[in-house]
From Swiss-Prot:
GO terms for cellular component: mitochondrial inner membrane; mitochondrion. SUPFAM superfamilies: Mitochondrial carrier. It is a multi-pass membrane protein. Expressed throughout the plant. The chain crosses the membrane at residues 10-30, 73-93, 117-137, 185-205, 223-243, 281-301. This is Mitochondrial carrier protein CoAc2. It is found in: Mitochondrion inner membrane. It comes from Arabidopsis thaliana. Required for the accumulation of coenzyme A in the mitochondrial matrix. Keywords: Membrane, Mitochondrion, Mitochondrion inner membrane, Repeat, Transmembrane, Transmembrane helix, Transport. GO terms for biological process: mitochondrial coenzyme A transmembrane transport. Belongs to the mitochondrial carrier (TC 2.A.29) family.
Length: 331
């Protein structure tokens, strides 16, 4: 009993923002790892690994399993988790901070989906800027394929491109292209994350408004709202994600086939012209399969973490009272 009270005392001494940071980070890491195999295949589809696109999802799973083993499904996941933990924590914190800043800075602002659209968009952009180099490294590592004579998998020449891990990829990219190289493809990322993050929050809040009051706290309904919001946001912004991936692996691809793509719009139109508009949605079906379990796992883990960390629920009446007090200060 005393031990339990002491444990609760330690947990209660942790600042609320730190609890939210921990909960968000753990949630991001677990959810991302759970869907890592689908993420790997999606990246291979997006970056024109034709030998995988031809055989589809099931064939790609079999091929990776035979040529690279179980760990092949998690190639690049270390960098992905290293990115998603701070990204998820920062994204959540930034969203709350931007939301409060808008409410307190502009007291007459009406609460609703539009507020979440703006706060979510800026939070997404902030998180991307701080964690983008890790996303770049994750993509480069996931793009690499170990060759096999038996299965005729086209591999990148080992002596030219293969990175030995996260640190090696970071250092080589920096030596070859400087800090600018670590942000190759960040423009389409920002173009995509601003509407995606904003639309995700917008759709989620808009759908929640139509949920009957007695079901507001129903986890299954929150899960459905979050999944649909994620799917809608992904569909509308997916072409920019494809452009980002191809820009990220541009140098690796050109080592096998001479090709240079420069700006975001140049890349987008060149993909459409040479490979067809269909390529801009390559891997989208896999992304649909990835988003739903990712959101489901995210909701579950986040709720469990908040429960263990004794994070109090965010009560709108209390928030409204704080806003009212702030408005009086401004006036």
């Amino acid at each position: 009993m005393a031990e339990g009270e002491e444990k609760n005392g330690i947990i209660d001494s942790i600042p609320l923002f730190a609890k939210e940071l921990i909960a968000g980070g753990v949630t991001g890491g677990i959810a991302k790892t759970a869907v890592a195999p689908l993420e790997r295949i999606k990246i291979l589809f997006q970056t024109r690994r034709d030998e995988f696109k031809r055989i589809g999802l099931v064939g790609s799973i079999n091929k990776i399993g035979k040529t690279e083993g179980l760990m092949g499904f998690y190639r690049g996941n270390g960098a992905s988790v290293a990115r998603i933990v701070p990204y998820a924590a920062l994204h959540y914190m930034a969203y709350e901070e931007y939301r409060r800043w808008i409410i307190f800075g502009f007291p007459d602002t009406t609460r609703g989906p539009l507020l979440d659209l703006v706060a979510g968009s800026f939070a997404g952009g902030t998180a991307v800027l701080f964690t983008y180099p890790l996303d770049l490294v994750r993509t480069k590592l996931a793009y690499q394929v170990v060759g096999s004579a038996k299965t005729q998998v086209k591999a990148i020449p080992v002596e030219q491109i293969i990175y030995r891990g996260i640190v090696d990829c970071f250092s080589r990219t920096y030596r070859e292209s400087g800090a600018r190289g670590l942000y190759r493809g960040v423009a389409p990322s920002l173009y995509g994350i601003f509407p995606y993050a904003g639309l995700k929050f917008y759709f989620y809040e808009e759908m929640k408004r139509h949920v009957p009051p007695e079901h507001k706290q129903d986890i299954s309904l929150k899960l459905v709202c979050g999944s649909v919001a994620g799917l809608l946001g992904q569909t509308l912004t997916y072409p920019l994600d494809v452009v980002r991936r191809q820009m990220q692996v541009e140098r690796l691809y050109s080592a096998v086939k001479e090709e240079t793509r420069r700006g975001t719009m140049q890349t987008l139109f060149k993909i459409a012209r040479e490979e067809g508009w269909k390529q801009l949605f390559s891997g989208l079906s896999i992304n649909y399969l990835k988003v739903v379990p990712s959101v489901a796992i995210g909701f579950t883990v986040y709720d469990i973490m908040k429960l263990h960390l004794r994070v109090p629920p965010r009560e709108e009446p209390e928030a409204e009272a704080v806003t009212t007090r702030k408005r009086k200060v401004f006036t």
